[in-house]
C-alpha cells in the first residue's frame, strides 16, 4: 500500500506537457543527432555485403515499429514522471511528448545497427553460438536473478519495469526462440561495445552535463562509469524483442 501511494504521487505530480509538439529555438549543439548519425553510418556502408538483410526491410520496419511503440510509451511515462529526462542543449529542439525527436529516432537507429551486427556475425562466423543446454542454464539463471531483483527493488520504477521486461523477454526466448537465443547471447556481448559508447556519450562521458539524465532514486544507483546498470537489461529487451519479431515474420526457415 505504501508503494502504491508513493508511486501514485510520482505520476500524479509528473510534469504534463502543455503541448504535444514543442520546439525550442536555442540549441547549443545537436550532439544527440550526431551520435545517431555516426552510429548508423557504419552499418549503412556495409549493407551491400549483406543483401539478405536488405531484402527484409519491410520485416525490419514492422518489428522495429512494434517494439518502438512499446518502449516509447514507457519512455514518455517515465519522462513525464521525472524518472529520466533530456538536456535540450544537445538536441535539435523539436520535442514530442516531452521527448526530443532524437529519442524517437533512437528506437529505429539502434535496433538497425544492432540487428545488422547480429546478422553480420552470423554471416562471418556461422559457428558463433552456444549449445542448447548452456543457453538454457544462462537464461534460467538470468530469469531467477532478475525475479529476485524485481522482488527486492519493486519500489524503484526503472529497476522494476526493466526487470519485468527482461523476465518476459528471456522467457519468450527460452520457450519459443531458443536457437535464436543461442546466437544472440554471444552477439549481444559484441553489440554492447558500441552500445556502451553511445550510451556513455549520452550520459555524460564528453559533456559537462548529460544529454540523458536519470533520477537515481528510481534505479539501483549503480553506474558503469556514467551508465545505469539497468541499461543493460533495457538494451537486451529492446534488441532481442526486435529480433524475435523480425524472425517471426520470416518465412519458414531455420532461425539459428
What role is predicted for each listed range?
Residues 45-58, 152-155:
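Short, hydrophobic transmembrane alpha-helix segments
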Residues 91-105, 218-233:
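Short aromatic-rich membrane-water interface segments that cap or initiate transmembrane helices
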Residues 25-39:
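Hydrophobic transmembrane alpha-helical segments in integral membrane proteins
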Amino acid at each position: 500500500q505504501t508503494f502504491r501511494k508513493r508511486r501514485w504521487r510520482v505520476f500524479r505530480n509528473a510534469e504534463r506537457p502543455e503541448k504535444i509538439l514543442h520546439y525550442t529555438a536555442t540549441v547549443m549543439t545537436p550532439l544527440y543527432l550526431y551520435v545517431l548519425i555516426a552510429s548508423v553510418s557504419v552499418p549503412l556502408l556495409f549493407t551491400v555485403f549483406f543483401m539478405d538483410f536488405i531484402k527484409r526491410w519491410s520485416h525490419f520496419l514492422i518489428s522495429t515499429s512494434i517494439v518502438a511503440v512499446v518502449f516509447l510509451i514507457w519512455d514518455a511515462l517515465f519522462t513525464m514522471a521525472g524518472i529520466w529526462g533530456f538536456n535540450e542543449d544537445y538536441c535539435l529542439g523539436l520535442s514530442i511528448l516531452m521527448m526530443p525527436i532524437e529519442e524517437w529516432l533512437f528506437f529505429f537507429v539502434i535496433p538497425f545497427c544492432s540487428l545488422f551486427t547480429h546478422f553480420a556475425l552470423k554471416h562471418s562466423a556461422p559457428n558463433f553460438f552456444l549449445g542448447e543446454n548452456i543457453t538454457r542454464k544462462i537464461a534460467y539463471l538470468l530469469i531467477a536473478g532478475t525475479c529476485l531483483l524485481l522482488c527486492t527493488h519493486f519500489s524503484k520504477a526503472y529497476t522494476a519495469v526493466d526487470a519485468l521486461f527482461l523476465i518476459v523477454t528471456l522467457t519468450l526466448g527460452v520457450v519459443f526462440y531458443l536457437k535464436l537465443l543461442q546466437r544472440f547471447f554471444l552477439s549481444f556481448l559484441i553489440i554492447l561495445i558500441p552500445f556502451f559508447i553511445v550510451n556513455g556519450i549520452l550520459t555524460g562521458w564528453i559533456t559537462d552535463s548529460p544529454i540523458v539524465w536519470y533520477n537515481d532514486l528510481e534505479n539501483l544507483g549503480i553506474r558503469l562509469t556514467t551508465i545505469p546498470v539497468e541499461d543493460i537489461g533495457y538494451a537486451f529487451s529492446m534488441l532481442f524483442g526486435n529480433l524475435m519479431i523480425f524472425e517471426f515474420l520470416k518465412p519458414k526457415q531455420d532461425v539459428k
